[in-house]
UniProtKB/Swiss-Prot annotation:
Highest taxon above the source species: Bacteria
Protein name as it appears in the record: FAD assembly factor SdhE
Family, per entry: Belongs to the SdhE FAD assembly factor family.
Localization per record: Cytoplasm
Known role: An FAD assembly protein, which accelerates covalent attachment of the cofactor into other proteins. Plays an essential role in the assembly of succinate dehydrogenase (SDH, respiratory complex II), an enzyme complex that is a component of both the tricarboxylic acid cycle and the electron transport chain, and which couples the oxidation of succinate to fumarate with the reduction of ubiquinone (coenzyme Q) to ubiquinol. Required for flavinylation (covalent attachment of FAD) of the flavoprotein subunit SdhA of SDH and other flavinylated proteins as well.
Pfam families tied to this protein: Sdh5
InterPro entries hit by this protein: SDH (IPR005631), SDH_sf (IPR036714), SdhE_FAD_assembly_factor (IPR050531)
Species the sequence originates in: Vibrio cholerae serotype O1 (strain ATCC 39315 / El Tor Inaba N16961)
Keyword Cytoplasm carried by entry: yes
Main location: cytoplasm
Keywords annotated in UniProt: Chaperone, Cytoplasm
GO cellular component, one term: cytoplasm
This protein's record includes keyword Cytoplasm: yes
Length: 86
């Protein structure tokens, strides 16, 4: 599990260089991070180390991450955001 200080750092890392990513990633972190398994939390943190153009392409469905754990996390993020608009 992550400490409050670590979560604060993760939240800061959710702030991206692209507003489009901020709008997708930050709500997922705030609403879902604590309910993820430890392995999923690790995948989320690892995903934040990705370059913005790659992350944007994956979230928009214009490509697929080769790492299966990260790809599954992208799918969770996308599904969470789609559930909010339906």
């Amino acid at each position: 599990m992550y400490t409050a200080e670590q979560k604060a750092r993760i939240k800061w890392a959710c702030r991206r260089g692209m507003l489009e990513l901020d709008v997708v990633i930050m709500p997922f972190f705030e609403e879902c991070f604590d309910s993820l398994t430890e392995s999923e939390q690790d995948d989320f943190v690892a995903l934040l180390e990705s370059d913005d153009p790659d992350l944007f392409a994956w979230v928009m469905g214009h490509g697929r991450c080769e790492n299966l754990g990260l790809a599954a996390m992208v799918d969770k993020i996308v599904a969470h955001n789609l559930s909010k608009v339906r």
